[in-house]
Structures are given as C-alpha cells and as structure tokens.
C-alpha cells in the first residue's frame, strides 16, 4: 500500500490551531492525555478478550512504556492495548467527534457497560501533543489482525497513513519535540517521572520508564533497568473495611502536607445514577493560610484514577476550606482541556455528598470523642461558623456542631446547644447570648441579673459571631435572645413589677438630667432591670447596629460607619445612682458624673473611649473630691 495523504476534518484543524496556541493552561498535560489514552486501549483489549481469549494470550502483561532520546529530541509512549487499523486511524485521529472510546461504548450499548473501564469520553486529548511536538508518528497493530499501520502528521491540515510491519499488538506514539526549551524539557528523566507520578500515579496498569543508556568509565554503553512509576494504591477505591487506621493516616500525610494527624476522616463509595469515590480528611490543626483570601483550597479530583486537578473548589464550600482529600468520579464530564468542569448538576450532586460526609464525620467525633472535638473546635470552629451566612441548606447540622463558652462553663470548657437547652431552668424561655470583646464579655455588667436568676448565657467573642447570629435565630423551639438588645423579659413577681414601675418614677429626674448631658452620645437613659452590682451599662436598640459590629466594620476599613446611639441603663439600687438621684432632686449640678458613668459603661463592655483624656480628667476630679 502506498502512502495515503488525507486532510483532517475541519473541526480537527480548528482544534489543532487551538492546541498549537496552548489551549491547555499547562503543556505537561499532553503526557497525561497520552497515558490515559493508552490505559483506554488496555481496557478495551482486556474487555474484548473476555469473549475472545485469542486477543490476549495467557501471560501477557498489559502495560505502558515510556522512552526518551535527548539527542534526537524524541519521546515515545508505547502500550500493548487493543491497537488500531487503518479505519480506526482515520476515524479516531482524523476526526474529532468520533473518539474510539465513544464508538466503543456505543457498540456496547446493549451490554453491561459497568464492566468496561473507560476514560476517553473527551476525544480530543490526543491533539494536545502538538503543543510540544513538531511531528508525530503513530505505529500500531490491532489485536486479531496482522497488518500494521503508520500514521504521521506535523499538526498542519494533513496526515499520512501507510502500511508498516509491526509484530506486537498495541500502539507506539513517537513525538519529535519542537526546538524550544519548554518542549525539549520533556526528554528530561526527572520531568517525565514527575509528570507521570503526579497525574497517573493510580492508573490500573504498570507505567514503566526506560532511562537512556549511559557510558561508563570505559566508554561502554550501560543499559539501566526500567523503573515502574505508578506503584501507589488508590486507597479511596478500596473497601473501608479493608483499610487500616495507620494506612489512612499515612495517606493523609501524602495529601495533607501538614505533618500532623487528621482529627477524623470519611471514606465512601456512591453508586446509582452517579458513581464516585471520596476520601476526605478533617485536620486537627488549622492550616497556616486558613485566613488568606487567595489561599488555595479544595479536594484533589481524579477521573478513572487519572489526576485532573488540585484544589478543586467546586467540590467544597469556602466554610469547609480546611478539608483535604480526594474525589474520583466515573461520570464527571470535563471540557476539552479536562481542567474546567462542565456539568454543574453532577458537580452539585458530588458536592452535596461530600458536605454531608464531612458534617457527619464531625458530628460523630462530637458525639463519641467530646474532648477531641472541643480541641478541634478551638482550632477551626470559627471557619465552620461561616456556614451560617454562606448557605441555607445545612443550618440544622451546623447548629448541632456549634460550641460556646458560657457563664456556666469552666475555663477551657465549651457547651453545645443541646446541652444548654437540657440544663435550662424552669421558667427560662429563650437561649441567651452576649457578643463582645473576649476579655470583657465574661465580666460584662449585663450578665449580673442572669447569673442571679441562674440563667446560663452563651458568650461569643469571634468577629464572625455577629454575622452568624443574623442567621441563627432559633434552635428547636427555643429562640435566641441577645441580652445586650432591648428589654429582657424575666418572669417577675407582682412585688418586683411594682418596684420597677416605682423606680421609673423615682429616677425620672435623674434620667432626664443624664440625657441632657449625654445627648450627643446616648439615645435614652432608663432604669435597668438587668443590673445587680454595677451602676450602669449600655444597651443596643432592637433596630440599631451593635457596638461589636460597629467596631468590626471600622476595623475592616469601611468608611462612614454610622455611629449608633446606645441606651444607658442605670441601676436604681447602686449607691452612686442613689447619690446622683438626690443631687438631681436637689437641683444640683451632676458635674463630671455623667461622663464618668458613660465612660465606665463603655470600658465594661470592651468598647474604646471616644475621648480618653476627657474621661481621665473627669475621674481625676471625682477622686480628688472624694479624697478631701
């Protein structure tokens, strides 16, 4: 047969133009494509041999071999898979919409497709070789046939096919690399090894690298032994019952890169309309870059044991960015470059599954290893809280995972919402909480009445807590109540109610005087029912921005943050307030006391003083007067 010259299909010519101009973001991926195609061919031969044993003689080792020749700038990938005949070469390499694998699946539509292990659902990866090769030769012999063929192209608009002797079934692809530094790099032994181990380390068949012969001291050529490059086990593909705990921990060190042990993990295999595997780890320590906006996060994505990408963010929400692990899909379609995911539906289903498994693993740790979970929460709980304002699907699961300090917990101990509700005393209707500065919130004057009543208050001091509580409005049938806002509805005796009403009238004059002096800073002055030992405190109106939110927005550099006027509550039983009431009734000047009370209320809640010098001067005058 004479050499036949043929033209590529129009779509192929367009594809070649894209490839030559680097459609892929990373040129090294061409080798991943060739190895994947070789694995396809091996799968086909193995499968067809089940019905025709002559296609795979006993003892045949299905494998992939890689050779380099630096002097000739050649890279060769050989497999002993199904091979191709002339028609296959024209249809598979001359057109784009009819990949060999695609036709193979179509021909088997009435058979058990689940037994066919195929990856080549894209049909265009082969052409990526022209990013690095100026010429390509494909020498092949199809299983069950005797005539071999040679396909040749320089990546222009044409290709040639000729008959060529070949004794071994399979395909040998030779790349004549371009005369540029990037392309020549693909004859480097370490480079080839690195790429194969990175992308194809878990491929089912052995991938063997053959080093170039080197001269010894005598000038004689020495042939080095071949080296298998993919000796790793796809742990996530194994049954969970067959994997030991130490194996899980060792694999975490491979993918986690933090040198520690995971807090817990989840290993699953989903079957049905979609089939995929996942092995996800929850680290015990926060990654060093957990708060960097541009930090990479996500899972490693594989398709048919072929590595596709690191840090696949589509499989995890930002509030689970600390999770490490692997997802492998049987059904995930990828675009031409295999780097950008196409099917949102499939990705969404996998994502939902992974999120559920992570939350289940955390809940299991919380239920069975409470101390361990407490330690984990202190490391990464603040990230998990982001889930309350970033999603609406998993709020119930997240609520059960929350942990808080409270007025009833010892130092270092935390309480869950379940525990809080179970130990609520009779008469308590709501879940009370207070947000503030970490050092000040524990001694905030607003806690005094709650402690006296025996009501536990959750204490929050993370910057994200304000955002979280905007979505966290109830737990079961219990609503949350911020004790720094509005009135507190305590159950009161008739005598207590009468005393409160009486105090409003008795202290009306003092409240009005304080309001006049502090009018620029204070919305209202009123008698408090929440104070026991302190003279005063600041309360936020139900419709106003909290002091904590105001401070946080200013710290974030937001300009023109509106100043919220607060409510100053005074304690009618405190000696200072009694003394000031007497002054007000006697029409005496309150002097520096209003500024002193306001400043004390600010400091007690952890807020900064608007004018520290003025406050110090007022306190100094009062102390000096008391010393005389």
Each predicted region: which residue ranges?
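GHKL (Bergerat-fold) ATPase N-terminal catalytic module, capturing the glycine-rich phosphate-binding loop
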Residues: 1-186, 194
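GHKL/Bergerat-fold ATPase module in large chromosome/replication-associated machines
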Residues: 118, 139-158, 178-185, 190-628
């Amino acid at each position: 047969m004479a050499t036949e010259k043929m033209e590529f299909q129009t779509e192929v010519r367009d594809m070649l133009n894209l490839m030559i101009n680097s459609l892929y973001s990373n040129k090294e991926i061409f080798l991943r494509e060739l190895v994947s195609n070789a694995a396809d061919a091996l799968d086909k031969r193995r499968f067809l041999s089940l019905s025709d044993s002559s296609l795979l003689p006993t003892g045949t080792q299905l494998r992939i071999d890689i050779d380099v020749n630096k002097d000739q700038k050649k890279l060769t990938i050989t497999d002993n898979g199904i091979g191709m005949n002339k028609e296959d070469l024209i249809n598979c390499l001359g057109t784009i919409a009819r990949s060999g694998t695609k036709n193979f699946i179509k021909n088997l539509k009435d058979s058990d497709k689940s037994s066919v292990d195929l990856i080549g659902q894209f049909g265009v990866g082969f052409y990526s070789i022209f990013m690095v090769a100026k010429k390509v030769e494909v020498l092949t012999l199809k299983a069950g046939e005797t005539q071999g063929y040679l396909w040749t192209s320089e990546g222009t608009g044409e290709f040639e096919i000729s008959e060529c002797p070949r004794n071994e079934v399979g395909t040998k692809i030779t790349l004549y690399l371009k005369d540029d530094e990037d392309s020549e790099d693909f004859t480097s032994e370490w480079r080839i090894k690195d790429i194969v181990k990175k992308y194809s380390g878990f491929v089912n068949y052995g991938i063997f690298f053959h080093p170039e012969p080197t001269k010894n001291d005598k000038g004689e050529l020495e042939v080095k032994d071949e080296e298998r490059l993919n000796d790793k086990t796809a742990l996530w593909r194994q049954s969970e019952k067959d994997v030991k705990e130490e194996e899980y921990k060792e694999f975490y060190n491979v993918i986690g890169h933090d040198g520690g042990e995971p807090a817990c993990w989840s290993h699953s295999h989903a079957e049905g309309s979609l089939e995929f595997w996942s092995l996800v780890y929850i680290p015990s320590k926060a990654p060093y870059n957990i708060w960097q906006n541009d930090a990479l996060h996500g899972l490693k994505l594989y398709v048919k044991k072929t590595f596709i990408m690191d840090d696949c963010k589509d499989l995890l929400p930002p509030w689970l960015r600390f999770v490490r692990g692997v997802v492998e899909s049987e059904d995930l379609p990828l675009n031409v470059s295999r780097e950008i995911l196409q099917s949102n539906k499939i990705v969404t289903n996998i994502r939902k599954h992974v999120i559920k498994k992570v939350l289940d693993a955390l809940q299991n740790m919380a239920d069975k290893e409470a101390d361990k979970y407490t330690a984990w929460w202190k490391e990464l709980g603040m990230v998990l809280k982001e889930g309350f304002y970033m999603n609406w699907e998993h709020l119930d699961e997240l609520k059960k995972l929350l942990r808080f300090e409270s007025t009833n917990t010892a130092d270092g101990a935390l309480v869950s919402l379940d525990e809080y509700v179970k130990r609520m005393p009779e008469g308590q209707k709501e879940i009370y909480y207070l947000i503030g500065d970490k050092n000040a919130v524990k001694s905030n004057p607003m806690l005094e009445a709650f402690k006296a009543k025996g009501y536990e208050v959750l204490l929050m001091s993370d910057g994200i807590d304000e955002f979280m509580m905007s979505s966290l409005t109830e737990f079961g049938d219990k609503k949350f109540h911020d004790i720094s806002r509005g009135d507190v509805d305590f159950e009161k005796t008739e005598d207590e109610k009468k005393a409160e009403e009486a105090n409003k009238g008795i202290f009306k004059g003092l409240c009005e005087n304080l309001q006049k002096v502090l009018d620029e800073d204070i919305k209202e002055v009123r008698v408090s029912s929440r104070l026991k030992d302190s003279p005063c405190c600041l309360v936020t109106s139900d419709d106003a921005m909290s002091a904590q939110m105001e401070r946080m927005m200013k710290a974030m550099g937001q300009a023109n943050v509106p100043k919220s006027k607060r409510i100053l509550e005074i304690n009618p039983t405190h000696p200072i307030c009694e003394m000031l009431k007497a002054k007000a009734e006697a029409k005496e000047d309150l002097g520096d006391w209003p500024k002193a009370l306001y400043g004390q209320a600010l400091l007690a809640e952890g807020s900064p003083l608007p004018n520290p010098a003025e406050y110090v001067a007022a306190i100094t005058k009062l102390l000096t007067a008391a010393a005389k």
